[in-house]
Amino acid sequence: MVLNEKDMELLKFKENDVVVKRVKLSTGEFYAKYCNIYEAFMELLGNKVFALSGIKCPTYHYIKEAYCVISDDVRKYDTYYHPFDLNMNGYTLRNVKGKLCDSGLFSNMDEINFQIDVMHFIDILFSNIDRHISNFGFARREDGTGYLVVYDNADFLTQFDKATRPMSIDGADSLSFVFTAKEVEAREFISKLSEEEILYLLKIYEMFSPIRLVTIIRSIEKENNIKLPDKLDVFKKYLKNYLMVGKLLKERGKIHKK
C-alpha cells in the first residue's frame, strides 16, 4: 500500500484521538487503530484467523511509521461488521464488548462458543501462556440478542459460559485450556470429556494444526514486514505439548466411535 505525506499525517494519532478512527486517505476510506508492534502483531494474527475461520472482514495492514494497523478500503465491501464492530481488537482481547448476535454474524450458540474457544486458544498459545482460562463470556438479553463480553478479570466471567454451555469438567469456562495442559493433567481432563466435547476440541485442533499456525505467523511477517521471532519461540516451546494433546484427543475420539 502506497501512502503519501498527507495520508501519513492523517494516520498519526493525536493525544485526544480515540483508539480507533475512520480516515479518508488518498487511496480510499479506512479504519485505523493505534498500536505498538506487539499489539499490531496480535491484531494481524486475529484478522488472519478470522478470515481463515470463514468470517468475511477487511484485511489489516501494519503501518509501522504511524504506529497503527489499518483496514482495507471499506468502500469496496457491501456489508461488513466484523471485526470493526469489535473496535479492531482482534486478539488483543482487552476491553472488548462486541456485538456478535446483533450483527447477525452467528445464528446459534454453538457457533458463538466455537469462535470464543478459537479466540481463547490462539490467545493463550501466542499471547500470554499463563493467562487465566476464564477470559470469555456470553450474556443474553431478554429479547434474545446478546453480547460477547471479554474482560481480564476472570472471576467476573464465571457465570457466563456455565450458563450457556455446560462443561463436563467442573470450573471450566472454556475447553481450549486443555491445549496447554501438561500430559498428566491433559489425560485426566480428556478422560472426563463427553464425545461432543472431544469432537469440538478436535475441530479446533484440525483447524489450527501446528504447520498451519507456523504458516500463519510467517505469512503475517512477510505481508507486513513485521518480525517478532519470540512468537515462534513461544510456539516451539509448546509445540511438543500441543502435539501430545492432539494425539490424546484423537485416541479418545476413536474410543468414542467404537
Language-model features: where?
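ATP-dependent phospho-/nucleotidyl transfer catalytic cores
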Residues: V69-F121, E142, E183, K192
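Conserved kinase catalytic-core segment
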Residues: K97-K162
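Conserved ATP-binding subdomain of kinase catalytic cores across diverse folds
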Residues: M1-G90
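Short alpha-helical "patches" and their helix-cap loops
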Residues: T59-E65, H132-R141, I255-K258
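C-terminal catalytic region of ATP-dependent kinase domains
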Residues: C35-N36, A139, D143-K258
